[in-house]
């Protein structure tokens, strides 16, 4: 590619870091780095009522823990109100948007985009050609007022000003794409290339959601359970993508080297915690012995072992290093029995 590749990850800090969003961040990172490009981060916090600092910190901390380093100073939409206002005023001045008096809802006035009512098509890297008749969208709302932009306007302006070349996101955003293309054309922006990823599904093929599946949809849940960050990345990379070989265990560097967006599947990918367990075990085996011993014994509290049992498993003449190796072997045996 002659143009520098720039991808973005734009989470909303309205809840714990969802495992589906982790995969979206990963695929954006892999694609950018595979092409020698930049992976940028922005926080979409226009929902003032639901956005919280603790969720933003959780997202930033999660990305750092996973080793997905961004290449910019993270931006926040809440700090760019003046930028959006400038575009809104220009759209209104050019009669591409207008103030609408509403008869329903809490807002008496909103700003609507003047829909040119045409067919929009784009070539999706995962799904091929996608077409929409935008007449069905009507004149859609893009802001509550010039100081309160809504999602569709803010995301388009941010992508445009950041020079984003590729928008890689979940398939639940496909219906947003025609609106965003219309807005982008109205402000004179160049269209990015789109790739819409298959959803991550539960075992019953329903979409993973906190409401239905609880805390098990969050990154922190797996971090607290002791999974390695590299194992989580490895497993998530295989949800909707494969390298075209039988290889299943990858380091992050190997994923960057092998990642090919053309190998992303269209159908939903089922999250299987047992498979994650296996991937995690394989990554533990790859650790240097010292790291492996520390990892597998860090939560072992000898004081909590009943005295009769302690006398059977402890040897007064055994060094600390030998004891660690014994415990490591015991844990490995238990793990294998559990399989």
Question: Where do the model's predicted regions map?
Answer:
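Active-site cores that bind ATP or allylic diphosphates and position pyrophosphate for catalysis
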Residues: 77, 97-212, 218-219, 243
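Residue-level signal for inorganic ion chemistry
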Residues: 28, 59, 91, 113, ...
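Short, histidine-centered active-site or binding-site loop motifs used for metal coordination
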Residues: 9-13, 43-45, 157, 161, ...
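Short, solvent-exposed beta-strand edge segments and adjacent coil->beta transition regions
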Residues: 14, 72, 163-164, 217
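Conserved nucleotide- and phosphate/pyrophosphate-binding catalytic cores
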Residues: 53, 67, 172-174, 178, ...
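Acidic active-site catalytic centers that drive phospho-/nucleotidyl reactions
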Residues: 18, 44, 139, 158-159, ...
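N-terminal Rossmann-like or analogous alpha/beta NTP/dinucleotide-binding catalytic cores
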Residues: 2-102, 176-189
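Proline- and acidic/polar-enriched loop/turn elements at helix boundaries
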Residues: 44, 75, 103-104, 196, ...
């Amino acid at each position: 590619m002659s143009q520098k590749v720039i991808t973005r990850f734009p989470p909303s800090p309205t809840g714990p870091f969802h495992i589906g969003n982790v995969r979206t961040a990963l695929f954006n990172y892999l694609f950018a780095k595979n092409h020698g490009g930049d992976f940028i981060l922005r926080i979409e916090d226009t929902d003032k009522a639901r956005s919280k600092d603790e969720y933003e910190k959780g997202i930033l901390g999660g990305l750092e823990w996973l080793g997905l380093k961004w290449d910019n100073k993270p931006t926040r939409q809440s700090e760019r109100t003046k930028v959006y206002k400038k575009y809104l005023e220009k759209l209104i001045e050019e009669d591409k948007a207008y103030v609408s008096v509403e008869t329903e809802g809490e807002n008496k006035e909103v700003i609507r985009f003047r829909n040119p009512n045409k067919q929009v098509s784009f070539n999706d890297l995962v799904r091929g050609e996608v077409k929409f008749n935008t007449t069905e969208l009507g004149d859609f709302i893009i802001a509550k007022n010039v100081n309160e932009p809504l999602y569709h306007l803010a995301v388009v302006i941010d992508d445009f000003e950041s020079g984003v070349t590729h928008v890689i996101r979940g398939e639940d955003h496909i219906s947003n794409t025609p609106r965003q293309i219309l807005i982008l054309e109205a402000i004179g922006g160049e269209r990015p290339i789109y790739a819409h990823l298959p959803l991550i599904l539960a075992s019953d093929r329903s979409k993973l959601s906190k409401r239905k599946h609880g805390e098990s949809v969050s990154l922190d849940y797996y971090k607290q359970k002791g999974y390695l960050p590299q194992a989580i990345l490895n497993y998530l990379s295989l949800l909707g993508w494969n390298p075209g070989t039988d290889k299943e265990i990858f380091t992050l560097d190997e994923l960057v080297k092998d990642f090919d967006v053309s190998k992303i599947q269209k159908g939903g990918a089922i999250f299987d915690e047992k498979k994650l367990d296996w991937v995690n075990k394989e990554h533990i085996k790859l650790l240097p012995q010292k790291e492996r011993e520390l990892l597998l014994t860090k939560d072992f509290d000898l004081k909590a072992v009943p005295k009769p049992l302690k006398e059977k498993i402890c040897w007064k003449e055994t060094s600390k290093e030998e004891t660690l190796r014994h415990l490591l072997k015991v844990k490995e045996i238990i793990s294998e029995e559990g399989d």
